Amino acid sequence: MDSQGPIILEKSIKIEEVIKIAITSIIDIVTKTVTPEIKAPYELVDVEYDKMGSDYILSILVDKEGGITVEDTSDLTNIISPLLDTIDPDPFPNQYMLEVSSPGLERPLKTADSLKAAVGSYINVSLYQAIDKVKVFQGDLLAFDGETLTIDYLDKTRHKIVNIPYQAVAKVRMAVKL
């Protein structure tokens, strides 16, 4: 503060944006720390850090061929928990609960490799901006060449094909066909 009063930023930053940046930073740090230690047959699927009620939850989603067992999650927790304690400086502003689990049926597809492996699967795609007035597509992933997702989806009762540029994708996950 100077003699003229408080300094006012030209652009106002919403508290939600600051929190989102902090969470992204925590996720990046945790991902870089645990990735080298999660070895075959396991695959790191995702890292999430969320507030649920008054608690913070750090979720490490791991999978393997044939699925994850309770014993697997226990073994991985015993590897991951001490690793997180070694991060310096501590990125966590609050105490958190560590949850190591399977990604479940609607697992996120975070990488180009995971999308290539999902060709032929039923997926849910959220976009940054709408294509033909649609921002969320759910359908069969027909192809992914690294740049474009080709999806067969239902528009009311008609099958349609849409090509979605990979850079337009905000989020992709597996979906359950009902």
Curated annotation (Swiss-Prot):
Gene3D superfamilies, per database record: Ribosome maturation factor RimP, C-terminal domain, RimP-like superfamily, N-terminal
One GO term of the biological process aspect: ribosomal small subunit assembly
Keyword Cell inner membrane found: no
A GO-annotated cellular component: cytosol
Principal cellular location given in the protein's record: cytoplasm
The UniProt record lists the keyword Cytoplasm: yes
InterPro entries noted in UniProt: Ribosome_maturation_RimP, RimP_C, RimP_C_sf, RimP_N, RimP_N_sf
CDD domains: YlxS_C
Keywords: Cytoplasm, Ribosome biogenesis
Localization terms from the record: Cytoplasm
Top-level lineage group: Bacteria
SUPFAM superfamilies xrefs: YhbC-like, C-terminal domain, YhbC-like, N-terminal domain
Pfam families associated with the record: DUF150_C, RimP_N
S-S bridge residues: none
Family of the protein in this entry: Belongs to the RimP family.
Role: Required for maturation of 30S ribosomal subunits.
Protein name as catalogued: Ribosome maturation factor RimP
Species per Swiss-Prot/TrEMBL record: Streptococcus pyogenes serotype M4 (strain MGAS10750)
Taxonomic lineage: Bacteria, Bacillati, Bacillota, Bacilli, Lactobacillales
Recorded name of the encoding gene: rimP
